[in-house]
Amino acid sequence: ICNGQWTSVGSAGLYYTIKADSMCVDIHYTDGFIQPSCQGLQVIGPCNRYQNGPRDFVACQTSGGSGHPICIQSTNGNIELCANCYCPQ
């Protein structure tokens, strides 16, 4: 479990929180389930929310690993956490 502040994010009735420190990102769902981020990535920037039509993104700038942002994509109630996916700029 990461250190840092929890930030609440809501999407289409699905609410979860995100917490990031220099090494990881935690996703905490309302049902209490916590999913850690991919290992080997360092969060070097704040997490931001992006909305693109029905898609809802939360992206954290990272270094290490692929170097791509960690992106949480929520579409139709589904969330994917990936280290190498498209995040809107």
Swiss-Prot record:
Entry keyword set: Amidation, Disulfide bond, Toxin
Q: Which cysteines are joined by disulfide bonds?
A: none
Q: Which residues carry this modification: Glutamine amide?
A: Q89
Q: Name one GO molecular function term.
A: toxin activity
Highest taxon, organism lineage: Eukaryota
Q: How is it modified after translation?
A: Contains disulfide bonds which may also be involved in dimerization.
Function of this protein? Blocks calcium currents via interaction with a yet unknown target protein. Has no effect on L-type, T-type, N-type or P/Q-type voltage-gated calcium channels (VGCC). Has no effect on voltage-gated potassium or chloride channels. Blocks non-L-type VGCC calcium currents in mouse duodenal myocytes (IC(50)=0.2 uM). Blocks calcium influx induced by hypoxia/reoxygenation in rat hepatocytes.
Q: How does it assemble?
A: Homodimer.
Protein name stated in the entry: Mapacalcine
